[in-house]
Amino acid sequence: MSRIKRGVTTRAKHKRILDQAKGYRGRRKNTIRVARQAVEKAGQYAYRDRKVKKRSFRALWIQRINAAVRAEGLTYSQFIHGAKLAGIELDRKAMADLAMNEGAIFNAVIAQAKAALPAA
C-alpha cells in the first residue's frame, strides 16, 4: 500500500485562500497564515455589513421623506401617522423614490395624509 501525503489538498486549500485574498495589501495577499486571517475577517465584515446595509438604506429613505415632507409643513412622524390613518400602504422605499423623482405625486400623497390627520 502506498503512502498518501496531503500535498495536493493542502496546495488547493492554500490556493483557494490566496485567490480570495487577491488585491489585499502587504503580506495579506501572499502569506497563507496572514491571508487566512484577513479572508476570515473580511467574511465577518461582509456578514455584519449585509445587516447594516438594510439599516442604512432605511435611514436614507427616512431622511429623504422627512426633507420632502417638511417642505409641505409636516414632520416625518406626523406624515407617517397620517399615512397610516389614510390607509396609504406605500413602504418607505417607494415613498422616498416618489419624493425624489415624482414630486407632484408625492405632494398628493402628503395631502391625503394631512387630510387624514385629526385637526389639532
Curated annotation (Swiss-Prot):
Keywords of the record: Ribonucleoprotein, Ribosomal protein, RNA-binding, rRNA-binding
Molecular function terms, GO-annotated: rRNA binding; structural constituent of ribosome
Listed GO CC annotations: ribonucleoprotein complex; ribosome
Protein's GO biological process: ribosomal large subunit assembly; translation
UniProt xrefs under PROSITE patterns: RIBOSOMAL_L20 (PS00937)
Pfam family, any one: Ribosomal_L20
HAMAP family documented for this protein: Ribosomal_bL20
Role: Binds directly to 23S ribosomal RNA and is necessary for the in vitro assembly process of the 50S ribosomal subunit. It is not involved in the protein synthesizing functions of that subunit.
Family: Belongs to the bacterial ribosomal protein bL20 family.
Name of the featured protein: Large ribosomal subunit protein bL20
Organism: Novosphingobium aromaticivorans (strain ATCC 700278 / DSM 12444 / CCUG 56034 / CIP 105152 / NBRC 16084 / F199)
Gene: rplT
